Amino acid sequence: MLSDLRYALRMLVKSPAFTAVAVITLALGIGANTAIFSVVEGTLLRPLPFPHAERLVVIYETLVENDARAAANALSDRTLTRFREFGRDIFEDVAGATYRIVAVGLNDGSPLQAARATGVTSNFFDVVGLPPAKGRNFSSEEARAGASAVVIVSDDFWRNTLNRRDDVLGRTLVVDGTPRTIIGVMPKAFRYPIRAQMWLPLVLEPNNPTTRNNHYLYGVARLRPGVTAAKAEGAVKRMCAASNRDDPDPANARAAYMLPLRESFVMDLRPKLLVIVAAAVCALLIAATNFAGLLLARVVEREGELALRAALGASRRRLVRQQLVQALLLAVIGTAFGLLIASWITPMLFALSPEASDFGGGVMREFDSAPRLDLPVFAFAAGVMALVGLGFGLLPAMRASRTDLRAAISATARGATLDRGARRLLASFVVIELAIAAALLTASVTATQYFRKLIEEPWGFETKDRLGFNVAVPDGFFPTAMAKQAALENSLAQLRTVPGVESATVVSPSPMGASWSLMEFNAEGAPAPEPSGVYTAYARVPVPGYFAAMGQPLLQGRDFRESDTADAPLVCIVSQSIAKRFWPNESPIGKRIKWGRLDAERPWSTVVGVVGDSKAIGDPGDGEVPGMIARPLSQMLAQATAPLFNITFVLHTNGRAITEATIRSALARANPNLAARNFWSMDDAAAQSHATERFIFVLVSAFAFLGLVLAAIGLYGLLALQVARRQREFGIRSALGATARQIIELVAWQCAALLSLGFTAGALATYGMVRLVRNQWAEMPAPNFIAWICAAIVLGVAMMIASWLPARRAARVDPVVALRAE
């Protein structure tokens, strides 16, 4: 074996051009796939940082059984408590969490800062199985009303805000006006759930009649060993049925839906990642096929030498082994360079990915999901190396073991053309490469069309010269609805005086990132849908003047007024799609909407206005508009039994740059107890909102370009070899009167035949792949006629360029030189 390795090294050194092309081909294919695998490994395969994470499930409440899309409702205190009490044979334990923005003071004289806080039940970290890295967990006593105020902080908060103080345990933070003692620091990169910066003990009130049906808890449970998902689903359904029987109010009836913890993060991302993986595998197949074609062409050139060695005693097994060793050596070198390429492009992939964007739908930012070249990635690269080196090197190696000396020497004689078997085999390799390249190009054009449609789709409001930021309005400083409203109004007044600000407004939740804020409602005169009993729409809670400040057109009726106070009749504004859906042939002004079911004891709100439709980050890509219902902030603050989420200020500027410090200063003048965070330009947010689709578009296009280049190299290699072997034929044709143009056309027709076969096969493969992908990702568009035509043109032009040099070489064959051997 060592002698075979030395022989392979000598042969590679003697043929530097062949070696360079083979290594570059493999490096590009393996490097790209290794980088993609690092992303997939970090997102889909890397174990979660919990013991027996496969037993962790997320529980939702829903009005439609077994409907994951309708399972946006969180748990109530009552439901979570019942699951704990009656699910002991299924769950080891059930925990809950809720999210809010808090104002944090460091007791060092610095201004308040906003932070993401998660209130968790005292058993939360026990359920997930991850204790603090420093300090201790919450005790059950600390999750009771009136208990000592404590907090656990994230590693990021400890490092970046508390400056990695060694004496962090026992220090005091003022959270929403309440001094809290730090009792723990969580492990590095742990921010679960909802990218938390700190965790507070959560007090449940399952028997409080005013809050028992507030669905605000994120529920996570650990299954008992041996409990299957099907058994757990059945038990949860039975518990929900029993709970519904005990509560005669049909408005409270709920079903439940469970998902494995990892699945809850990646169920929407998986099919999109699989599209990228498929494109990467296609590029690898082109590279591997090209590699096999290079090896086969090399064997064809050396057939005489190999046959002579066989005649002198070299066994067939020895010849095959030497060729496989050479192929494997090339694969090793190509993989080494591929890993270098992967190490270079992996950070670029992460920068492009949704995980690096605040508005791009990143799903794994609670954990360490950054792609990196670790042991699983190296193992993947080694597996690909072995597959390519041995699998794709076997056929050329078998060809090298042909032992017919006379046939081999005749085939390599001057003027001899390629035999039919070699010609067909090499042509088959090129057709395969062209087919895969055609599929990739078609997918790339389709992705381009889809991405362009997304970015050109209007938001329904203006994003130009709009700045947004979130604020925390803590109960500790603002205990009443009037206090909260006064703080927000004073802040608006101060912000409107900032130079460069033309208008300022407030809304909850964020106008762009609210696709998760679905509300349940019924419209007067419309039958309740079955079986859920409710419709859903996006919720908005703005101040008067919000729609004008955002440039969202008022189509009918009026905007909210200052007189729409807590004591005034309840009013709402609906979007155009809601109006058309429920009152298509009449004016919606004066109609009424009720939150929840029709038979629920809740007040009606009167529709006073209709605005244009708008979209939100995370909307389905099929163009369906869910609709929006807005309620005035003053009425919601007075009536809400749960806090408003993501209270967002939006500033409309005259184009002048306004700094974060200027905004903070204006807020501090209005009220020093308001803390702001998460400043962003709405234009930037709009650009980042399609980070997932952009990621797919960029990578599929990159792989299509890579496949196109490799396919062109493969076609060039085949035509160059055939032209070299057909010099005698071209010489005879020239001697008999064939012009250079006719000979070029002869080579071009051969190229066109291969291209036609390849594109036809690629079209069939694309059709099958699209149907497969759309089973998992319904929004994935099918290629249209324009996509096919564009792919055909690009592929045709590239192949014309690849065939031009061999065709010119064929046209310049000197008949005298070509026939001299005769």
How should these model regions be labeled?
Residues M1-T19, L261-V266, L295-R321, V325, ...:
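Alpha-helical transmembrane segments of integral membrane proteins
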Residues M1-V21, F50, A72, P111, ...:
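Membrane-helix entry/capping segments
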Residues S15-T43, I286-T289, A331-A336, L426-Y450, ...:
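Short, strongly hydrophobic transmembrane alpha-helices
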Residues L28-T62, L296, T346-A356, I436-D465, ...:
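Alpha-helical transmembrane segments
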Residues I36, A292, L328-L405, Q449, ...:
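Small-residue-rich transmembrane alpha-helices
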Residues E41, L48-I101, N214-V220, L259, ...:
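Membrane-proximal extracellular/periplasmic loop immediately following the first transmembrane helix
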Residues V102, R116-S140, S148-L274, P347-S353, ...:
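Mid-to-C-terminal secondary-structure elements
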Residues T289-A331, A416, I713-A752, R809, ...:
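Interfacial "coupling" helices/loops that link adjacent transmembrane helices in transporter permeases
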